[in-house]
């Protein structure tokens, strides 16, 4: 192997940085006795390449990451199969589900031999809990029975840091909502059931007494309330019968579940001004519905609209002097004794179109241009009398008074 010569420029950690005779900078592993400025000879295989070093470390990092991913996946699979919560269904029979974090069934526990034989054929493992509740109600014909569903989290899940408490409570609330909806949809309208969320302590008591979670709650409450019910009574009686004697409303959080009745259509309100239709009395025929074979009541004829009232006739305008025929003479004006006051002529109302066309007459000539016209009858009956001379009358009276 050919050797190269170079001078040590710098010593850094376990490396010696060398400048070769052809002015290249390379690194080799540091050896004892090396110092800066020393001329040495070295082989090409002693040169440490940075790219090769980076690729080596990259391979190591990728291997570690792959191992970590495999560990996480296997850990999640193991945890998903681990029991996270318990849900018990108690009615005439009792059955309990062990659930994982996804609310899927890991294991089914039976507390009645008859229930075991009936439900074994369902194969509820790995099924969602709402599907399992629906199938149990349908298979055991519990839609007319009172159902008690109890739920709790496993103890190891409740002993966590305060930061995860909200997450656990949300998971339990979601599980309770799933159970409530499953019961409400699949039971009858007249049956009221209960969904209860309790602590893990009741699950411990249930395992001790070999009862389901729901029946263990009823048994403990019966002892607190002084009700004479032993474990055999709790096991054999239906849950609806025991709940009539034992009150469990103060245990954990209790949700009363009842199917909503279908809403009846609201009666139509009559329009304002229209009379409400009269309901026929019981036993009497409805007048609106004619009997078969008989003609129905005659329909009233529609009211005819009233004819429009004629408008009152407008008074005809009085004829003017200029409009009179030529063969008729204008009667003379009545002369009134001189009393020092000029008589006022009555105003004559003309149509609007003529008032606009005619110019306004002079006020001084008003009496002469527009004298009053009387009817022909009155002119013939009342002749015009000339006024007497006042001076002649006075002279006549003075002659008559003389002796």
Curated annotation (Swiss-Prot):
An example of a Gene Ontology cellular component annotation for this protein is: plasma membrane
Record's protein name: Anti-sigma-I factor RsgI8
Region Disordered, residue ranges? 254-403
Locate the transmembrane regions by residue number: 60-80
- Give the main location: membrane
The organism that produces this protein has a lineage beginning with: Bacteria, Bacillati, Bacillota, Clostridia, Eubacteriales
Q: Check the record and name the Pfam families matching this protein.
A: RsgI_M, RsgI_N
Bias type Basic and acidic residues, positions: 254-314, 324-335, 349-403
Record's function text: Anti-sigma factor for SigI8. Negatively regulates SigI8 activity through direct interaction.
Extracellular compartment spans: 81-403
Q: Which gene encodes it?
A: rsgI8
RsgI N-terminal anti-sigma domain mapped to chain residues: 4-51
> How does the protein's chain sit in the membrane according to the entry?
Single-pass membrane protein
InterPro entries in the record:
Anti-sigma_RsgI_N, RsgI_M
Describe, as the record does, how this protein assembles with itself and its partners.
Answer: Interacts (via RsgI N-terminal anti-sigma domain) with SigI8.
Q: Which residues lie on this side of the membrane: Cytoplasmic?
A: 1-59
**What are the UniProt keywords, alphabetically?**
Cell membrane, Membrane, Transmembrane, Transmembrane helix
- What are the subcellular locations of this protein? Cell membrane
> Which domain of life does this protein belong to?
Bacteria
């Amino acid at each position: 192997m050919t050797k190269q010569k170079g001078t040590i420029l710098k010593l850094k950690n376990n490396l010696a940085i060398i400048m070769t005779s052809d002015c290249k900078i390379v690194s080799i592993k540091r050896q004892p006795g090396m110092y800066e400025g020393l001329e040495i000879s070295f082989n090409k295989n002693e040169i440490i390449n940075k790219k090769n070093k980076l690729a080596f470390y990259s391979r190591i990092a990728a291997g570690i990451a792959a191992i970590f991913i495999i560990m996480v996946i296997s850990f999640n699979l193991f945890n998903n199969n681990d029991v996270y919560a318990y849900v018990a269904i108690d009615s005439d029979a009792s059955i309990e589900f062990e659930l994982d974090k996804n609310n899927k069934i890991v294991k089914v526990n039976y507390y009645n031999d008859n229930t075991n034989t009936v439900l074994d054929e369902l194969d509820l493992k790995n099924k969602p809990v709402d599907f399992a509740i629906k199938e149990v109600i349908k298979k055991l014909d519990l839609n007319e029975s009172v159902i008690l569903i109890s739920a709790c989290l496993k103890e190891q899940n409740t002993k966590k840091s305060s930061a995860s408490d909200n997450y656990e409570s949300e998971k339990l609330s979601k599980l309770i909502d799933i159970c409530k909806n499953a019961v409400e949809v699949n039971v009858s309208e007249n049956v009221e059931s209960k969904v209860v969320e309790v602590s893990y302590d009741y699950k411990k008591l249930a395992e001790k007494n070999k009862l389901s979670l729901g029946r263990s709650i009823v048994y403990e409450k019966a002892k607190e309330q002084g009700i004479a019910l032993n474990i055999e009574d709790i096991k054999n009686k239906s849950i609806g019968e025991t709940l009539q004697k034992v009150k469990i409303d103060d245990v954990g959080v209790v949700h009363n579940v009842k199917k909503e009745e279908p809403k009846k259509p609201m009666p139509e309100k009559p329009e304002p001004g229209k009379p409400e239709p009269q309901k026929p009395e019981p036993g009497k025929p409805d007048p609106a519905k004619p009997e078969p074979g008989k003609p129905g009541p005659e329909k009233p004829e529609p009211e005819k609209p009233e004819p429009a009232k004629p408008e009152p006739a407008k008074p005809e305008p009085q004829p003017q002097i200029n409009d009179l025929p030529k063969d008729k003479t204008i009667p003379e004006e009545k002369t009134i004794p001189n009393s020092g006051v000029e008589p006022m002529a009555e105003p004559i109302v003309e149509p609007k179109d003529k008032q606009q066309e005619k110019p306004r007459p002079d006020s001084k000539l008003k009496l002469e241009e527009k004298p009053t016209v009387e009817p022909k009858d009155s002119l013939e009956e009342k002749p015009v009398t000339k006024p007497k001379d006042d001076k002649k009358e006075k002279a006549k009276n003075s002659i008559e008074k003389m002796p």
